[in-house]
Every structure is written in C-alpha cells, then in structure tokens.
Amino acid sequence: MARNRQPVLKKCRALGIDPVVLGVNKSSKRGPRPNANKKPTEYAVQLREKQKAKFIYNVMEKQFRKIYEEAARKLGVTGLTLIEYLERRLENVVYRLGFAKTRRQARQIVSHGHVAVNGRRVNIASYRVKVGDVISIIENSKNLDIIKTSVEDATVPAWLELDRAAFTGKVLQNPTKDDLDFDLNESLIVEFYSR
C-alpha cells in the first residue's frame, strides 16, 4: 500500500497548512520561501487546494480521484459531496470522535483492528460510515493508553455523538462544510478536475 512519508512540517509549510490541523504541536522555524511573493497561477492555486485535501485526509491521488468521480456522479453540489465523502471515511470518523490524536494515528488504530462498526470489526481505513452507524473500540483495545488519553481531550463535532464511558460513537447526520476543522475551498478542487 502506498503511503505519504514526507516530513509533516515541510509539507504543511509548502501547502500553507497550520500543523495543528494534523495534530502536530510544532512549528517550523524557517521563514517564508524566497519566491513566496510571486503570484501563483490559477492552476497552481487549484493544485495546492487539491494537494492540501489529499494530505490532510491521507489519501493518494488514485483514491482521491475515485472519490471525486463518485461525488460528481451524485446529484447535488459536487464539492460539498466530496467533503462529505472525505469526512465520512472511517479513519477520519475515529479521529473526529477523539479515539486518536491525529488522522494518521486513527488510520493505524483502524488498520490494526481496534475498531468495530455496528459490532463488526473493520480494518479498512477508507470504509465510509452511514447515518446511524455505531463506531466502537473493541473490548480488548479499550485499555490502550493512546485511546484512553485521546478520548479524555476529545471535542466532537455536531454530526457525531460520543459516549466516553463506553468508547462508542454514533453518526447522527451527514457532515457539512461547516463541520470541517480547517479551511478548504472545495470549488477549486472541482475546477481542477473539470479542466
């Protein structure tokens, strides 16, 4: 399986992302790039927005394009549907429920089999949850320090519900753009793919 192994701070700096969005509490000591004051082209702005979404959600290009094409086929606004699909990925839901400090840690928790959806163990990070699904940590994994400490500090968005004592969460409704924890201009991504 292909994975992005670039240094997180370096990539955040290049894409203009605050590292706190990724759960990294560091900041780069380096100043702005020498050519940072050059006006980027329209293509460069669109590409950067797409790369930002891919990097934050930890999705490779082929999978991101499949998600976009699926969102484009569905009735409604393509950009908002794309955001909804990315937010409903299991690794992201585990992160948003507070079972992990970062999305990357959430991906590892899912792939190691610590998560169940509706009582069945799921180890596929890209699994898309639906409204009414119950996401829980399996019984043996509830004692893991990583999960315990993460749940204590969790702030859960309005589209999810968390039961801290039982280590379970429920999807109440589909996420919207307002539920994002970072700035994303989805229309630039749609423009990029519709060239």
Predicted regions and their residues:
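Short, well-ordered loop/turn sites that connect or cap secondary structure elements
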Residues: A100-R103, I109-V110, V129
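Ferredoxin-like alpha/beta domains used as RNA- or RNAP-binding modules
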Residues: M1-L97, I124-R195
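Short, surface-exposed recognition loops or helix-turn segments adjacent to catalytic cores
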Residues: R104-Q108, R120-A125
